[in-house]
Amino acid sequence: MSQPLLRALFAPSSRSYVPAVLLSLALGIQAAHAENSGGNAFVPAGNQQEAHWTINLKDADIREFIDQISEITGETFVVDPRVKGQVSVVSKAQLSLSEVYQLFLSVMSTHGFTVVAQGDQARIVPNAEAKTEAGGGQSAPDRLETRVIQVQQSPVSELIPLIRPLVPQYGHLAAVPSANALIISDRSANIARIEDVIRQLDQKGSHDYSVINLRYGWVMDAAEVLNNAMSRGQAKGAAGAQVIADARTNRLIILGPPQARAKLVQLAQSLDTPTARSANTRVIRLRHNDAKTLAETLGQISEGMKNNGGQGGEQTGGGRPSNILIRADESTNALVLLADPDTVNALEDIVRQLDVPRAQVLVEAAIVEISGDIQDAVGVQWAINKGGMGGTKTNFANTGLSIGTLLQSLESNKAPESIPDGAIVGIGSSSFGALVTALSANTKSNLLSTPSLLTLDNQKAEILVGQNVPFQTGSYTTNSEGSSNPFTTVERKDIGVSLKVTPHINDGAALRLEIEQEISALLPNAQQRNNTDLITSKRSIKSTILAENGQVIVIGGLIQDDVSQAESKVPLLGDIPLLGRLFRSTKDTHTKRNLMVFLRPTVVRDSAGLAALSGKKYSDIRVIDGTRGPEGRPSILPTNANQLFDGQAVDLRELMTE
């Protein structure tokens, strides 16, 4: 199946929605001249200034954005296949060529991609891999590069724990003790900031920084208090100092002149006191995780703490506690910790590292089923009445209607319960009759179902579109005081299209998906009286797969081809050439069914990506609804998705009368 067809499977309609991308070329001298000339500007070639651009993007495809930047700047970009998504830029200012390129680097950085210069070309890759490809070349604040920083005075082993909190997750920091140097892979602007900090630390005698180990307070809270005190001027004498929080070791690093550092050290030590809250108890409100689930995890960790602490016998006041209490308050989604200060600090550090926002995954499925049924049936049946009780007939039921059934209906003056499709011709008299049936049917059907659902990483999700059908499982009758009471037991089952998925996001752009997909339906020819003898068709797939972000993959399929031939005839007479057609009935059936299931996962890591994805889906459904509706009527759906919740109802009667 071709790539355009695979992409078409996930398009809600044949109309494509392309976000408006406005790149307007303007000259500074034109604007002033246009105001005086009523908008008709004429600029002599000799007076033209440097070209400027105003860029406004709304849910634009990131690859289209890269193409536009390449046309403007003349740069050559090699784009990694994993570079996908939509970008939005709102700007009213006119940008020069260098400012346009700087904006481009910032947009790539915001969406998790890095531009790595390689000679006359530039590669656009995810941040996770950019650090292995970072090199030299033209320096820009948002470019990823690798730099070696030579340290003159301080040992690099002492600087590593101080600098590591400043390096983001996608960056890299390593020490070379033999050369007393540091290797940093990060964006140029951050490397410059880190290098400035290293130069402040790398002073003779190491007198320009102080390290404070906090015992009772949380380092992030203490750093916030110190920074607020300096910004508001409340910490007199602390001008020129800088506070760095190392959450991994719960330490404060203070940079600056000795007098300023002494002032901040004194303030930090006054904050690090065993209060009633911090000594034994701590209430932590979670922002992203579930309190009940996290309490179970901490409970297992605390059991390990008690087991390790209890191996040496009874614990003292300086050892680990014999009792650790962890409770979850589901109403406020908070954790309550009760233990000694060291244990509370250790558990709180674990909570801070676990309480991080999880990425989400949008899973879109396309279920394509193409089926065809060709049926040919022809038959001749005879009946002869000799009078009295005598008679002869040829009775064939494989064409849908037998002559015996027809005769019984005539005797009882009732019409047959069912009459098959096709041509039915009857001839004869009271003593002789012939019934000729013929049918040629060709049935084709195409089914496309596209269920989709959004779920958190490592969270199972399910969607079902169908019916809840009752199935009779049993019946019995009870006798009580001479009366009978019939009972029937019924079990309801879901029939339709269902999709269950559990995504797991791995490092990089790969995902592991646990998928359960099922299609079930009631067969139309099943007996449905009193919910008995119901027959359902079922096609299901259960698998675990690996897929890239945004990749369209096929997870399973079925190609079925059934051919059946049925023939009923009178022995010997039905085998006579030509004449034998009057004494036999034939039915040929050819059924073909093709079923394929495609899947496309999309990772959503932040609110901006979720908003862009939701906006695109809403725009797609508006395209299906029609911007003006049939015959020019206004669309029922508003232009903005937020207007769906403003409480203003749409009067369909007005739309029908327009």
From Swiss-Prot:
Annotated region described as Disordered, given as residue ranges: 302-322
Site positions for May serve as a pivot that allows opening of the central gate for substrate egress: 466
Keyword annotations: Cell outer membrane, Membrane, Protein transport, Signal, Transmembrane, Transmembrane beta strand, Transport
Cellular component terms per the entry's GO annotation: cell outer membrane; type II protein secretion system complex
Annotated Gly residues bias: 307-320
Coarse class of the protein's main subcellular location: membrane
Region ranges (N0): 51-141
GO molecular function: identical protein binding
Chain positions covered by the region annotation Secretin: 368-606
Chain residue ranges for the region called S domain: 608-658
Chain intervals for the UniProt region annotation (N2): 206-279
Effect of a null allele: Loss of export of PrpL, elastase LasB, chitin binding protein D (CbpD), aminopeptidase PaAP, and metalloprotease ImpA, still exports LapA and AprA.
Residues covered by region (N1): 142-205
Signal peptide (UniProt feature, chain positions): 1-34
Coiled-coil segments: none
Superkingdom field: Bacteria
Spans annotated as N3: 280-365
UniProt remark on domains: The N0, N1, N2 and N3 domains are periplasmic, while the secretin and S domains form a channel that is partially inserted in the outer membrane. The N1, N2 and N3 domains each form a periplasmic ring; the N0 domain was present but not resolved by electron microscopy. The secretin domain forms a double beta-barrel structure; the outer barrel has a diameter of about 140 Angstroms while the inner barrel forms the central gate with a small pore in the closed state. Isolated N-terminus (domains N0, N1 and N2) assembles as a hexamer of dimers (i.e. dodecamers).
Family stated for the protein in its record: Belongs to the bacterial secretin family. GSP D subfamily.
Subunit and interaction comment: Forms a cylindrical channel with 15 subunits. The closed pentadecameric channel is 170 Angstroms long and 140 Angstroms in diameter.
Function according to Swiss-Prot or TrEMBL: Involved in a type II secretion system (T2SS, formerly general secretion pathway, GSP) for the export of proteins. This subunit forms the outer membrane channel. Among its substrates are PrpL, elastase LasB, chitin binding protein D (CbpD), aminopeptidase PaAP, and metalloprotease ImpA.
Name the UniProt record assigns to this protein: Secretin XcpQ
